């Protein structure tokens, strides 16, 4: 094999947000969960991971860059995925470049990987899930694996449990499985993103800082010390999974919202039941929950669902665009930006919803009237600056390959651009 060539693949995967939570493993090595879970993949136009994987004979070791900074690949998560994919590699022939890589050659070759998240990393927005899913998807394409996305999800699971659900768009279920080797613990798509395209999702980024207790550590502590987690896994989640599947199939928003809110609250109750207790949500998170609960109760039926993963950021799911505009009005009233904040950077993603809200700048936000449900109890002080920014998005597609023009690595050297 000539030393000068570089072969690259670039892919993009969505982040996913749980509506029935995964928390706790029965096998730490294989990353096998103690219960099924369901997530929604979000529109990668707004929230995604892009990853380029390259191979070249002269690469001396596997290297990875995340958001422009080199990180260690010595940890078990990436190495286990690499081993699994290398073992399944097939012959590759690139007629244009005159390159042939035999199956046995992949064991000797090293990879350069560059990954970029267009959202806060390690802040409760499932960044590791999207990153591992994109890594596995791109590497599998480069090594010409024949496995479908369901089979690839079992490999991605070895790196990050939630990653297996980012290999599909729309609504995705991670089956806990029963086999000791984890062969039946895979992701399946319940419905694609077009099935329920009325939904609009608003994410309140309360904090982009890295959380104090990682999900891995938190799960281990909960499984060791919480009595509630065992009751949840055995008695509560199996029923909720069936109910949530039914709600998604029928597009039954009131049931969907009640289940999502209840499961989020119970997940964080498990965190509080852990010793020492884990605090992923904060005072601002509580205020957002209160805002949604008051509105839902005043109308008599859920207009918005809320859910929080392992972090303070609120994921709010509105039943349609009209409700999403009313939601954003409420959020901007309660959580306005600092006076020197550019409104264009305060609401990102699908900014067209701002037109429905009637907001063009911070002065418009300052003049928003209080929501009717709090007219008799208007807060004396607004929570200026408690939310860093809002992201407006929707359910989205699964992973895709991107053209070489979108690559994060130099096609001549295989190093970051």
Swiss-Prot record:
Predominant location: other
Highest rank taxon of the organism: Eukaryota
InterPro entries found in the cross-reference section: GHMP_kinase_C_sf, Mev_decarb, Mev_diP_decarb, MVD-like_N, Mvd1_C, Ribosomal_Su5_D2-typ_SF, Ribsml_uS5_D2-typ_fold_subgr
EC number: 4.1.1.33
Pathway membership: Isoprenoid biosynthesis; isopentenyl diphosphate biosynthesis via mevalonate pathway; isopentenyl diphosphate from (R)-mevalonate: step 3/3
UniProt subunit comment: Homodimer.
Its biological purpose: Performs the first committed step in the biosynthesis of isoprene-containing compounds such as sterols and terpenoids. Component of the triterpene saponins (e.g. ginsenosides or panaxosides) and phytosterols biosynthetic pathways. Catalyzes the conversion of mevalonate diphosphate to isopentenyl diphosphate (IPP).
Protein name (record): Diphosphomevalonate decarboxylase 1
Gene that specifies this protein: MVD1
